[in-house]
């Protein structure tokens, strides 16, 4: 498995956009495929915010993760964000998610980010805790109960 900037994998962009829309669309009901695809296409460089990375094997994309300045207009008080972690169903349980999270945290550390945030459903908290993330707060985001978590990227990479 290798992890590449999404700009290096243009053939996969429509499939990734569709997967993101299916996985995260309930939180953003006005979001559509064209917006998801446009957002991914705007992530043209590695080592900057925003960017998206894709985990790949020899024949397919396995998952993706983004590093964003702002993730959702309702939670702009925290920034930046690890966002849109998605692993294809057939690749789950194989360390793809962990590798993508570690890659994003490392990139944030290289950019000097003091605290990196994510939000997730409560059932996913143990997954992130085992990777060093801590609970920051909990609240309702639209119809969904979410947990905001944070990590100090520089502390993880030292």
Regions found by a protein language model. Give the residues of each.
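C-terminal "cap" of GNAT-fold acetyltransferases
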Residues: 119-122, 131-134, 138-158
């Amino acid at each position: 498995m290798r992890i590449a900037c999404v700009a290096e994998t243009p053939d996969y962009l429509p499939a990734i956009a569709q997967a993101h829309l299916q996985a995260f669309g309930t939180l953003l009901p006005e979001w559509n495929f064209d917006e998801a695809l446009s957002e991914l296409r705007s992530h043209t460089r590695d080592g900057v915010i925003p960017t998206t990375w894709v985990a790949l094997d020899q024949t397919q994309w396995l998952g993706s993760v983004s590093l964003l300045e702002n993730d959702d207009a309702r939670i702009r008080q925290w920034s930046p964000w690890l966002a849109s972690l998605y692993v294809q169903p057939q690749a789950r349980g194989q360390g793809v998610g962990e590798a993508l999270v570690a890659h994003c945290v490392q990139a944030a550390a290289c950019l000097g980010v003091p605290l990196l945030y994510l939000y997730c459903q409560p059932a996913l908290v143990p997954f992130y805790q085992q990777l060093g993330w801590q609970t920051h707060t909990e609240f309702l985001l639209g119809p969904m109960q979410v947990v905001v978590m944070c990590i100090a990227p520089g502390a993880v990479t030292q």
